């Protein structure tokens, strides 16, 4: 890939388009902008631009297109697969200043936002207006465009679906700087190919998202959680298909193991309600009446006890809610704090294979003498599994990491699983995407990329590009 290097003349031209105080070069660019949350892939942009409008993005994309300069878009940088890392230098568009909630439409139940709005800010805003944005990824400081770019899911996906199900419309800037609208406030659309849905999950490789119209729901009046301990992960995960069949529909079904809970206790400095069992499922129920919620959780509680659960804890006090949900929210950071370096397997498998897959990771950890803690969304089969470096030397770490990842993704494929449930492919997981889908499937993806971005300027060498 032969791109133009950014020169002094380019910087001067860019500062004619964007105020100089929002254009950064060289040592002005902080180290954080060279990597994402996981930090295993590093590369600096040649110029960092903090954009504030669709029009500014359009101006920069036109300039980049005319001068053959690659462009990477970054939000909060909370990704885990290197998707926002500028492998070829070039321009980085940083969108966190585009953080306005533009409109709340209470008749159509939509909210229109700029790309840099944080998930936690969006959730707080709509809930203050008695409305509800269901997608609930664990990283609440992620931007909404980052969520859209990976089709993030989160804990509530088992009942409410994922980000794609809540994107009604997008404003995007194409590689050549053209601005187009995709979708809108409409509920139904059979008008040709759904370009909006191609953009969702494309990880910044097709265009730049500058505005989103999101679907909302009325806020449920009541929520309640259950924490249910089991003797082992096979029993805990094995109960999930039976819960789904029981006709009680939990908002969330999370699984967690004792060791991960202990990491969170150490990290947060406070105790979990119970950490004596080897495995747990955490369920949430919501609804508009106390009777509805109680009927559902009693059905599930009785089912779990009949299937070997050791107890059922109702998470109904402020103290217990804080203890349980702060721990669940801290699992990733707690595991990260327990080791010197780590990498993640964001695999998704059918619900009835979760227990087998986790048991496989236990056996793999023992065989390879590495720590492989995990947690995840049992309700939708999306597992978050971490290979920890600890005290391994660089050579041993690289060898063991590669082997562990290869074997886990290969096992997932035998279970009819896929490489990523919600964190995306980015740079780090490309070969596993190829293993899952094969060359013909990836050639179709590459053709879509070529149509949107004929000069291959947007986030090159990511997702389907080997």
From Swiss-Prot:
Cellular compartments annotated: Cytoplasm
Source organism superkingdom: Bacteria
pH dependence per the UniProt record: Optimum pH is 7.0.
Major place of residence: cytoplasm
Gene Ontology terms for molecular function: D-lactate dehydrogenase activity; FAD binding
Disulfide bonds: none
One Pfam family linked to the record: FAD_binding_4
Catalytic reactions of this protein: lactate + 2 reduced [2Fe-2S]-[ferredoxin] + 2 NAD(+) = 2 oxidized [2Fe-2S]-[ferredoxin] + pyruvate + 2 NADH
Reported cofactor(s): FAD
Activity modulation: Activity is stimulated by divalent cations. Highest stimulation is observed with Ca(2+).
Residue span(s) of domain FAD-binding PCMH-type: 41-219
Temperature dependence of activity: Optimum temperature is between 20 and 30 degrees Celsius.
The family this protein is said to belong to: Belongs to the FAD-binding oxidoreductase/transferase type 4 family.
Subunit details: Part of the stable heterotrimeric lactate dehydrogenase-Etf complex, which is formed by the lactate dehydrogenase LctD and the electron-transferring flavoprotein (Etf) alpha (LctC) and beta (LctB) subunits.
Function: The lactate dehydrogenase-Etf complex catalyzes the oxidation of lactate to pyruvate. It uses flavin-based electron confurcation to drive endergonic lactate oxidation with NAD(+) as oxidant at the expense of simultaneous exergonic electron flow from reduced ferredoxin to NAD(+).
Name of the protein described by the UniProt record: Lactate dehydrogenase (NAD(+),ferredoxin) subunit LctD
Organism the protein comes from: Acetobacterium woodii (strain ATCC 29683 / DSM 1030 / JCM 2381 / KCTC 1655 / WB1)
């Amino acid at each position: 890939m032969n791109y133009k290097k950014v020169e002094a003349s380019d910087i001067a031209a860019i500062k004619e388009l964007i105020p100089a105080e929002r254009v950064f070069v060289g040592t002005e660019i902080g180290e954080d902008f060279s990597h994402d949350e996981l930090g295993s892939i590093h590369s600096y942009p040649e110029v960092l631009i903090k954009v504030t409008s669709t029009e500014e993005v359009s101006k920069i994309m036109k300039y980049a297109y005319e001068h053959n300069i690659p462009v990477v878009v970054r939000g909060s940088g909370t990704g885990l697969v290197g998707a926002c890392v500028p492998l070829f230098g070039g321009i980085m568009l940083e969108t966190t200043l585009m953080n306005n909630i533009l409109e709340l439409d209470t008749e159509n139940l939509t909210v229109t936002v700029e790309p840099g709005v944080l998930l936690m800010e969006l959730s707080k805003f709509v809930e203050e207006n008695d409305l509800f944005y269901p997608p609930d990824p664990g990283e609440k400081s992620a931007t909404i465009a980052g969520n859209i770019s990976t089709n993030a899911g989160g804990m509530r996906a088992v009942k409410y679906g994922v980000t794609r199900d809540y994107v009604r419309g997008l404003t995007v800037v194409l590689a050549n700087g053209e601005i187009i609208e995709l979708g809108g406030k409409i509920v139904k659309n059979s008008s040709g190919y759904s370009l909006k849905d191609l953009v969702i999950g494309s990880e910044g490789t097709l265009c730049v998202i500058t505005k989103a119209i999101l679907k909302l729901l009325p806020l449920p009046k009541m929520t309640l959680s259950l924490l249910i301990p089991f003797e082992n992960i096979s029993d805990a995960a094995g109960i999930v298909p039976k819960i789904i069949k029981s006709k009680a529909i939990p908002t969330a079904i999370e699984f967690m193991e004792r060791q991960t809970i202990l990491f969170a206790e150490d990290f947060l400095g406070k105790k979990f309600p119970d950490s004596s069992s080897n495995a747990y499922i955490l369920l949430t129920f919501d609804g508009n009446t106390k009777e509805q919620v109680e009927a559902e959780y009693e059905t599930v509680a009785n089912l779990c006890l009949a299937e070997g659960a050791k107890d059922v804890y109702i998470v109904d006090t402020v103290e217990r809610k804080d203890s349980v949900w702060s721990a669940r929210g801290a699992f990733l950071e707690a595991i990260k704090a327990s080791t010197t370096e780590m990498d993640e397997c964001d695999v998704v498998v059918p619900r009835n294979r979760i227990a087998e897959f986790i048991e496989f990771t236990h056996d793999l950890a023992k065989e390879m003498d590495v720590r492989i803690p995990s947690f995840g969304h049992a309700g939708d089969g999306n597992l978050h599994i971490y290979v920890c470096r600890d005290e391994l030397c660089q050579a041993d770490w690289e060898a063991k990491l590669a082997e562990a990842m290869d074997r886990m993704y290969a096992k997932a494929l035998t279970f009819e699983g896929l490489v990523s449930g919600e964190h995306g492919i980015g740079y780090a997981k490309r070969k596993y995407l190829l293993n899952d889908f094969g060359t013909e499937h990836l050639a179709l993806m590459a053709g879509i990329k070529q149509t949107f971005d004929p000069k291959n300027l947007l986030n090159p060498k990511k997702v389907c590009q080997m």
